[in-house]
Structure formats: C-alpha cells, structure tokens
A protein has these predicted regions:
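FIC/Doc superfamily catalytic core
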Residues: 1-129, 133-196
C-alpha cells in the first residue's frame, strides 16, 4: 500500500500520507538550517535550498513538473475558494530577485515591513508547492535576524492569517494584527520558558 498509493492506514477511519510524514521530518531539518543561517541574506539560492530540503524524499522530488529546488513552471494560486492569483511562472525570477534585493538593502524593525514582505512573497508564490511553509519560515528567520520576537501562525489563527493575506491590498491591518497577536503569544511562551 505504501508503494502503490503513498499512504498507510492509521486506523479504520484515516490514512497517513507518507509525503506528509516526510515533509514534517524534513521541516525539522529545515528549521535547524534556518537557525544556523539566521544572519545570511535571503537569495534565490537560499530559497531553493529550503525548498529542496522540505521536499526531499517525497513524490514531488521525482516529478519534473514540481521542479523541486527551482521556481514553479505552472501557474498556481493561494486557496481554492476566493483564490488569490499569483505571479506567472515566467515573471517569478525577476519578481523574487527584486523583492529580495529591496529587502536585503535595508534593516527592518516595523511589523508592517515584515507583513508587506511576507505578503509579497506569498503573492509571488514562487514554488509549485509549500510556499506558505517556506514563507512563514523565512518570516521567522528575518524577525530573528532583526532581533525581534519571531512568531508561528497557530492552526487556530490560520483563518485570520489567510484573511489578512486576501485583504492586504485594501487593509493591511488584518495581517499586521494577526502577526502581532502571534508575536505576543510567542513572547508569552518564551517568558514562561525562561521562568522555568
């Protein structure tokens, strides 16, 4: 069953997708790499490495259409209902280069700057898959690089995060407020950990 469908029966009601297990394991390695490279400027090559690390061993790695370790080859979108359109594949290399050059040129300390950067990365959606995970991880990295409290989007706040991305052009406060709330939550966790 693992070979034919890429799944394992967890119990009578559910399947475990092998690629999900691999990506979860790979995510830990990718996170360690990000922590080791906090002070490194973002480049296309850095993003390619993250994408390759996350997709290592998955079916996508063997599928040339997925272009693991490279930019997307086919159009994609964010979400399925009320989908947000993303940058066309031919425009991605220039869009990413421009975004990263502008970002790396100046220090950032305002959460709005980080929200704008994250929104722009997500709307470029440079990879065939896992753009959200990579985008949120580089947001974490760049907050650390700026000596600011990082954040993790909790599952319970994912709808607010997605709303923030969808409405960002009209009202950036949804995304900024969601990121700020997650930053506050992470601050509380760190403070509790330091008390132990």
């Amino acid at each position: 069953q693992v070979f034919d469908t890429g799944t394992i029966f967890a119990d009578e009601n559910g399947l475990i997708v092998v690629d999900d297990v691999l990506e979860t394991s790979n995510h830990f390695r990718m996170f360690d790499y990000v922590l080791d490279t906090i002070d490194v400027d973002l480049t296309s090559e850095y993003l390619f490495k993250l994408h390759t690390m996350l997709k290592r061993g998955t079916k996508s790695e063997l599928d040339s259409k997925m272009n693991v370790g490279g930019f997307k080859q086919f159009p994609n979108q964010i979400g399925s209902i009320e989908a947000v359109q993303t940058t066309l594949p031919a425009e991605v290399p220039h869009a990413i280069q421009s975004l990263l050059e502008k970002w790396n040129a100046d220090p950032h300390s305002n959460l709005l700057d980080f929200a704008k950067f994250h929104y722009r990365f997500e709307t470029i959606h440079p990879f065939s898959d896992v753009n959200g995970r990579i985008g949120r991880l580089i947001l974490f990295k760049e907050l650390c690089k700026a000596d600011l409290m990082p954040l993790v989007i909790r599952e319970s706040n994912k709808p607010f995060y997605l709303r923030g991305l969808k409405k960002f052009e009209d009202d950036d406060s949804y995304l900024v407020d969601t990121l700020g709330a997650e930053q506050d939550y992470y601050t509380q966790l760190v403070e509790r950990f330091l008390e132990i």
